[in-house]
């Protein structure tokens, strides 16, 4: 059986048509400011040399720049940096030029409601953990950001909270989920991925299985709140990184491998605050160690682009449909995620097959 056979099933055909409508999205990423109230442990912005650029602060210069990006074919923008909320005029200039996109924010400063982008509000832990992982710029323990986030964005449909798992905060999710759910918001997951410098103590490798269990527990306890799938949990907590499991379509990886750019690797750019970019850092999270990459933003492009790797069985195709459906619900306002097509039983079966394969490989190696 193959793809043509799979889409003869109504539920698979319907889901495929639903996600295919959004295949026109062509993204790039933009650091819009080097200013931030916080210094978070393992923050990717303050890695490498990009934070040392001189900021372009003129909103009209940004407006002209986004016009050129639109002409280049970009239809979706990811605005980040240090903290985008501190440059509201630049956000407005972008939104008025390219109206589809998202903003990564700590949520401490409200973004103008007229800027209709998806807002990804970062959460690093509960009321005890968040101040430990996120300090003020002067080094003092930071705030527990969640109360301020909930107050700033009450009843704001633009918002999705993104909880980043690290090596010690799985249990802290309970408090966060209860508060986010009570406020009527949605939440998705990220997995801490080591920066290239390899200096963060938050690396998660020894806690991947516990993280996966917590993800699934949350999905099943808060199905109306958590935007995630079993396949998301499977691939983002695998012992192998996304790069090792699927390869990577981003220009940074293609350049390192010396392969011919196609698709995303031809168009994606990661711009710095001075409107410059470098091929060697054209990636959604440029200063991540590829060998440890489990980042949710990276997966949105990596897994979604690997359609051919997911059509050799119906189960894999169902998993891929769930993943793309989840990614679209995470990154687009008003996109409603459907029911899981790749069930918990599918997830368990896939993990057992993986274990059996690894065991078989180990036995063969022992014989040799």
List each model region and its residues.
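Conserved alpha-helical substructure of the radical SAM core
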Residues: 2-113, 313-323, 358-361
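Processing junctions and N-termini across compartments
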Residues: 30, 34-37, 242, 277, ...
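Local cysteine-cluster metal-coordination motifs and their immediate loop/turn environment
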Residues: 35-47, 247, 285-299
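Short loop/turn motifs at secondary-structure junctions
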Residues: 39, 73, 115, 183-188, ...
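Flexible loop residues that form catalytic
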Residues: 48, 82, 124, 192, ...
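Radical SAM enzyme [4Fe-4S]-AdoMet core and its adjacent flexible, acidic
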Residues: 92, 117, 121-278, 282, ...
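Flexible mid-to-C-terminal extensions adjoining Fe-S/redox cofactors in radical SAM and related proteins
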Residues: 260-368
